């Protein structure tokens, strides 16, 4: 169905493949997508705050004609998906990996379609518990429910067991098969295989860390593996940026050599070193020579001092907080 609102075929393709909901036998038109967005916002504002959108017709026409755009994440999820969880309305987020709960929270947020910036810096990873020295197979079975919360809960329960030195079984029989339509969120199910792969990966990673804390690189790898299970219609759908210590050589070379063969999950994140002050010339050259040698263009730069200066100029938050960033990192640009 040709849509006359878009100047190019590419724009029309992006709408149909990313934002148009399935209506039983066809996808939404652009006009129907925009109407769904405004219906949801109008109804929500009236129900919760007794507020009606002024000049709705004028605003709707501005979006239809591509003069302005609302939150594209909300444009995609407006309706039952966004009504169930407002996480689905956010484009991006940030979390330091300083607690075991960070892993299942990242899984849940990514499944809601929200990008995740995370820090695997030593100052955060050092807060994680020590992994048990010994592991034993148990009869405990984690029953994973067929929902975003169910997947996240399953990972949380597995990690809790592993910290206690127990290797449980898991039951994924309740998950819908690959290709089944996701009526609320849209797209099609990946089936249980990606989650099963993640749970096995997690067990092996913890066994290799027996008797010590997870290293920053292991935290990074686990988050990247988590992102790899976010599959919609056979397409990977997750956005990550990983922040790491400037002096971490293991993170510096994480995408060097044939990493794409041995550690393909690392391709799910862009990697950036955190600069908290001007580095000495030796450190600077070492980092940039590594970037050149990697042929991957990484690691990039996240200037934490610049982020703090930006916050100070806005006078709305504590500028001494150790800020991270969202995957695009445009939030600190002037």
Task: Annotate each PLM feature.
Residues 1-334:
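Extended catalytic cores of very large enzyme megasubunits
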């Amino acid at each position: 169905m040709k849509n006359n609102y878009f100047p190019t075929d590419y724009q029309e393709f992006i709408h149909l493949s990313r934002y148009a909901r399935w209506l039983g036998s066809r996808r939404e038109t652009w006009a129907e997508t925009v109407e769904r967005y405004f219906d949801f916002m109008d109804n929500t504002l009236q129900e919760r705050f007794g507020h009606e959108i002024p000049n709705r017709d004028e605003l709707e026409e501005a979006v239809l004609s591509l003069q302005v755009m609302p939150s594209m994440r909300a444009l995609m999820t407006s309706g039952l998906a966004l009504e169930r969880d407002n996480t689905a309305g956010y484009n991006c987020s940030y979390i330091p990996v300083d607690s075991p709960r960070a892993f299942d929270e990242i899984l849940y947020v990514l499944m809601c379609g929200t990008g995740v910036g995370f820090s695997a810096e030593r100052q955060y990873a050092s807060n994680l518990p020590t992994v048990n020295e010994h592991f034993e197979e148990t009869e405990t079975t984690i029953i994973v429910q067929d929902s975003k919360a169910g997947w996240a809960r399953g990972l949380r329960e597995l990690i809790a067991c592993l910290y206690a030195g127990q290797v449980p079984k898991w039951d994924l029989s309740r998950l819908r098969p690959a290709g089944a339509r996701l009526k609320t969120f849209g797209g099609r199910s990946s089936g249980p295989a990606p989650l099963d792969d993640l749970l096995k990966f997690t067990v092996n990673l913890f066994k290799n860390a027996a008797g010590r804390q997870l290293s920053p690189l292991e935290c990074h790898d686990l988050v990247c593996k988590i992102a790899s299970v976010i599959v919609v219609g056979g397409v990977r759908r997750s956005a990550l940026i990983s922040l790491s210590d400037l002096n971490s050589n293991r993170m510096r070379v994480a995408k060097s050599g044939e990493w794409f063969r041995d550690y393909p999950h690392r391709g799910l994140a862009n990697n950036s070193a955190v600069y908290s002050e001007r580095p000495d010339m030796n450190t600077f050259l070492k980092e940039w020579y590594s970037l050149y040698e990697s042929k991957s263009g990484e690691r990039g730069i996240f200037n934490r001092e610049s982020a703090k200066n930006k916050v100070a100029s806005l006078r709305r938050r504590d500028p001494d907080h150790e800020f991270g960033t969202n995957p695009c990192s445009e939030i600190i640009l002037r």
